[in-house]
């Protein structure tokens, strides 16, 4: 079935910045997608096209990207008359139309909006749910669907928060729950205990939430943050059922080959900056003391040596996730696999810019025995595509923020609906989240 109309406009994301929305029409109806945007972005990501006109939206307008959809992509794609259920063909057409390696001509945000809207239209054409269409495209293992463990970002530091804490995200991981819905309930209870403990210890305003719904108290060290989370898990009565994950986002505090854990202080003492191996020692201490099952971006995106050194020490003990390291880019993923730098991919569709390339990145990772964590961005919207993506590719783990703020809950609520719809045709990844694709 062909596409009859494509229309784009700008709408606003959860940080109040403009972003691209695309509506794609076929005989089956009109299908909408909204593109997210990140705060800490890797230098190797596909290009998100912003207008740069400082007189509007502080330079963050997306009028060019919207015009690229309406004036360039729409007429060309409609004329090409490609079957909307053939996602690979649509994405290939979009890539050729752009013609640059990083989607700089049309903008990854323009291309992705069309790619995701087409996937929704393709699912409707086949009369199947979006996650089933994605499973077909990705040639996922047949059998029961896998519902992901929700990694919930409950405490924020780094570039996502004020205070001195260098590490960006601390997540609770309800891997001991019997089902997704129970995992979400446990997460929400731990989160409420964490909020009240935080207010008690750091004052009322410390309960305010950051971009992704986590609390952002004025915490100095990772140990202090982890102690607070462990106390919340205990207070909720779930010790042993809830693990912890961290996203360090260490590229944000990598300077001159060293790591500055006091990077938010403009006068930080250079003599206290530490080397990759010293930072690795800090992680090893934390791994020994806390139930940490996953560490994302422990080192800077081009500090390959530090990644390989650390991974050789902790392989099999905890999952090491590449985000800024890999930026969902096949060339970077291949290098990370070959250098044994990590064993899991953080999958962000807007880092690469089409659904087909995102699925390819996941499949390349699975083939190497890696895990895949499907992720939101800090600038999110009400679009729930990544919920279906996570179920469709059997990722077994998803990162969509705290159980707070509607743009975060939109994804978690969508997985709740999928769980209900599938009933006994689905299993919860639980402790097997790292190898969920083969369950």
UniProtKB/Swiss-Prot annotation:
Its EC number is 4.2.1.11. It comes from the Eukaryota. Homodimer. One of its GO terms (cellular component) is phosphopyruvate hydratase complex. GO terms for biological process: glycolytic process. Mg(2+) is required for catalysis and for stabilizing the dimer. Disulfide bonds: none annotated. The active site is at residues 212, 348. It catalyses: (2R)-2-phosphoglycerate = phosphoenolpyruvate + H2O. Its main location: cytoplasm. Gene3D superfamilies: Enolase-like C-terminal domain (3.20.20.120), Enolase-like, N-terminal domain (3.30.390.10). Substrate binds at residues 160, 169, 296, 323, 375-378, 399. Belongs to the enolase family. This is Enolase. Pathway: Carbohydrate degradation; glycolysis; pyruvate from D-glyceraldehyde 3-phosphate: step 4/5. Its cofactor is Mg(2+). Mg(2+) binds at residues 247, 296, 323. One of its GO terms (molecular function) is phosphopyruvate hydratase activity. It is found in: Cytoplasm. Keywords: Allergen, Cytoplasm, Glycolysis, Lyase, Magnesium, Metal-binding.
């Amino acid at each position: 079935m062909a596409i009859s109309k494509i229309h784009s406009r700008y709408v606003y994301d959860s940080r109040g910045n403009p972003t691209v929305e695309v509506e794609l029409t076929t005989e089956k109806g009109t299908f909408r997608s909204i593109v997210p945007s990140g705060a800490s972005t890797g230098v190797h990501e596909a290009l998100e096209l912003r207008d740069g006109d400082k007189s509007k939206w502080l330079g963050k307008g997306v009028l060019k990207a919207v015009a690229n959809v309406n004036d360039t992509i729409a007429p060309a794609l409609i004329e090409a008359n490609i079957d909307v259920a053939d996602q690979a063909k649509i994405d290939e057409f979009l890539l050729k139309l752009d013609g640059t390696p990083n989607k700089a001509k049309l903008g990854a945000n323009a291309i992705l909006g069309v790619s995701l809207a087409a996937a929704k239209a393709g699912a409707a054409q086949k009369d199947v749910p979006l996650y089933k269409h994605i499973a077909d495209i990705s040639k996922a293992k047949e059998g029961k669907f896998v519902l992901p463990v929700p990694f919930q970002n409950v405490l924020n530091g780094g570039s996502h928060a004020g205070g001195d804490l260098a590490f960006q995200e601390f997540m609770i991981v309800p891997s001991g729950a019997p089902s997704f819905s129970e995992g979400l309930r446990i997460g929400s209870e731990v989160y409420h205990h964490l909020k009240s403990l935080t207010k008690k210890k750091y004052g009322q305003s410390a309960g305010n939430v950051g971009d992704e719904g986590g609390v952002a108290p004025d915490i100095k060290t990772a140990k202090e943050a982890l102690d607070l989370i462990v106390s919340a898990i205990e207070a909720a009565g779930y010790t042993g059922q809830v693990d912890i994950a961290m996203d360090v986002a260490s590229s944000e505090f990598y300077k001159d080959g060293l790591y500055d854990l006091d990077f938010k202080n403009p006068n930080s003492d250079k003599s206290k900056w530490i080397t990759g191996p010293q930072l690795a020692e800090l992680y090893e201490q934390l791994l020994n003391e806390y139930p940490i099952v996953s560490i994302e971006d422990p080192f800077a995106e081009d500090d390959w040596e530090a990644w390989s050194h650390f991974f050789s020490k902790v392989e099999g003990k905890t999952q090491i996730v590449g985000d800024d390291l890999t930026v969902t880019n096949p060339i970077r993923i291949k290098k990370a696999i070959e250098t044994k730098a990590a064993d899991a991919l953080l999958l962000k569709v807007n880092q690469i810019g089409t659904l087909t390339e995102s699925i390819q990145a996941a499949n390349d990772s699975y083939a190497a025995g890696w895990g895949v964590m499907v992720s939101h961005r800090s600038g999110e919207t009400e679009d729930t595509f990544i919920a279906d993506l996570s179920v469709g590719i059997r990722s077994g783990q998803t990162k969509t923020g705290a159980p707070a703020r509607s743009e975060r809950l939109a994804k978690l609520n969508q997985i709740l609906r999928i769980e209900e719809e599938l009933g006994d045709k689905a299993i919860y990844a639980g402790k097997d989240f790292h190898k969920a694709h083969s369950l």
